[in-house]
Amino acid sequence: MINQIDIKTRERMEACIQTFHNNISNIKTGRASPTLLHNIYIEYFGSKTPLRQVSNIIVEDSHTLKINVFDDSITSLIRKSILNSNLDLNPVLQGKDIIIPIPRLTEERRKQLIKVIRGDAESSRIQIRNIRRDANDKVKRLLKDKIISEDNEHTSQSKIQIMTNEYIKKIDCILEKKEKELMKF
């Protein structure tokens, strides 16, 4: 029973870390990356289709992305989708390809992004602590129902606390890495 609680807790904390990592990986650092366009969808044959399924996204250099479109008829749709996204990008048509220059970040914009990232990190830490609280409550219920002993309760809560510390450190490492990446340019 306690092992199931530990496993579920670890899975939930891992999902929280993954969500945090995905959220901040979409934040522009002034460097070209195909992941920047992973949330772009176009209307293709009546359904929303991810950009990466209808094209190849290539890093030309550190400040330029190139999109090789598989079907020339949707090039303008892709350009329009990128313009309508909130990424502040200005795609340029070049033959059947789309070139996207990635603007350099200003110092002010970097500081704003760092504040946003730190806010996301704090929200993720809070989620981790809430997951810990839920797990500890389940363990206390098991003790109350006399399914486990007090020793088992203390051992389990210690494991949960160690897990919590581990995942909060992971959040801090991801945050630190992203901050360095933002301040690099």
Swiss-Prot record:
One BP term from GO: cytoplasmic translational termination
Q: Where in the cell is it found?
A: Cytoplasm
UniProt keyword Signal present: no
Q: Please give the superkingdom of this protein's source.
A: Bacteria
Q: Name one GO molecular function term.
A: ribosomal large subunit binding
Give a Gene Ontology cellular component term annotated to this protein.
cytosol
Q: Which InterPro entries match?
A: Ribosome_recyc_fac, Ribosome_recyc_fac_dom, RRF_sf
Give the UniProt keywords, A-Z: Cytoplasm, Protein biosynthesis
Give the matching Pfam families.
Answer: RRF (PF01765)
**CDD domains to which the protein is assigned, alphabetical:** RRF (cd00520)
Which family does the entry's similarity section mention?
A: Belongs to the RRF family.
- Protein purpose: Responsible for the release of ribosomes from messenger RNA at the termination of protein biosynthesis. May increase the efficiency of translation by recycling ribosomes from one round of translation to another.
Q: Which HAMAP family match?
A: RRF
Name of the protein in its database record: Ribosome-recycling factor
Which species expresses this protein natively? Answer: Buchnera aphidicola subsp. Acyrthosiphon pisum (strain 5A)
The gene name on file is: frr
